[in-house]
Amino acid sequence: MRKRQQSQNEGTQAVSQAPGNQRPNNTCCFCWCCCCSCSCLTVRNEERGDSSGRSPHTTKMESIQVLEECQNPTADEVLSWSQNFDKMMKTPAGRNLFREFLRTEYSEENLLFWLACEDLKKEQNKKAVEEKARMIYEDYISILSPKEVSLDSRVREVINRSLLDPSPHMYEDAQLQIYTLMHRDSFPRFLNSQIYKAFVESTTSCTSES
């Protein structure tokens, strides 16, 4: 009986020490993850979204709007964002981090809409302009869309008239209105968020270590 118990204990220890049961170390750095496709923040926010019971809505344009490729910003650059919203919005790393914050507030569609408008303004092909303009309307302007952005009636009327002959700049008024909303409403909370503070800390530590 004693030998049988001893052999069972040894078998249990062997299973618990097997390589397949060991948890791999997560070596993904916070400051790297903001700019790469394996964003830790994205994973964490998706987990929070699943646990909250809120079903995510994926739109046509959002499927295109993945995190932008960018270089890791310096600590000085990250700190400068707190003084200048325009400067942050001009950098891919800044937009990526701001987008992660907006996702926690369920207002990511504001930035996605702004990015889609920026993309439309670069388009020169008439058919492509018409297609992108229609997709933007369906995803962010239509009252039937789960990603509808908040616009006043005047701007909506301008957009509806422009749909008859779409142009690359047809959403400029709406884009400015959403940009102003993000600047005045979301940006102050972003600067006080744990997402921004942790990113500042991580970039500062990365700079000091190098």
UniProtKB/Swiss-Prot annotation:
Residue(s) carrying Phosphotyrosine: 137
Region (Disordered), start-end ranges: 1-21
Functional note: Regulates G protein-coupled receptor signaling cascades, including signaling via muscarinic acetylcholine receptor CHRM2 and dopamine receptor DRD2. Inhibits signal transduction by increasing the GTPase activity of G protein alpha subunits, thereby driving them into their inactive GDP-bound form. Binds selectively to GNAZ and GNAI2 subunits, accelerates their GTPase activity and regulates their signaling activities. Negatively regulates mu-opioid receptor-mediated activation of the G-proteins.
Domain of life: Eukaryota
Record-given protein name: Regulator of G-protein signaling 17
Domain named RGS: residues: 84-200
Subunit structure: Interacts with GNAI1 and GNAQ. Interacts with GNAZ and GNAI2. Interacts with OPRM1. Forms a complex with mu-opioid receptors and G(alpha)z/i2 subunits, including GNAZ and GNAI2; the formation of this complex results in mu-opioid receptor desensitization. Interacts with HINT1.
Species annotation: Mus musculus (Mouse)
Coiled coil location: none
GO molecular function: GTPase activator activity
Record has Isomerase as a keyword: no
GO cellular component annotations of the record: cytoplasm; membrane; neuron projection; nucleus; synapse
PTM statement from Swiss-Prot or TrEMBL: N- and O-glycosylated in synapsomal membranes.
Keyword tags: Cytoplasm, Glycoprotein, GTPase activation, Membrane, Nucleus, Phosphoprotein, Signal transduction inhibitor, Synapse, Synaptosome, Ubl conjugation
Entry comment describing in which tissues the protein is expressed: Detected in brain (at protein level). Highly expressed in the hypothalamus, periaqueductal gray matter, and pons-medulla. Lower levels in the thalamus, cortex and spinal cord. Weak expression in the striatum and cerebellum.
Cellular compartments annotated: Membrane; Synapse, Synaptosome; Nucleus; Cytoplasm
SMART domains in alphabetical order: RGS
A Pfam match: RGS
One example of a Gene Ontology biological process annotation: negative regulation of signal transduction
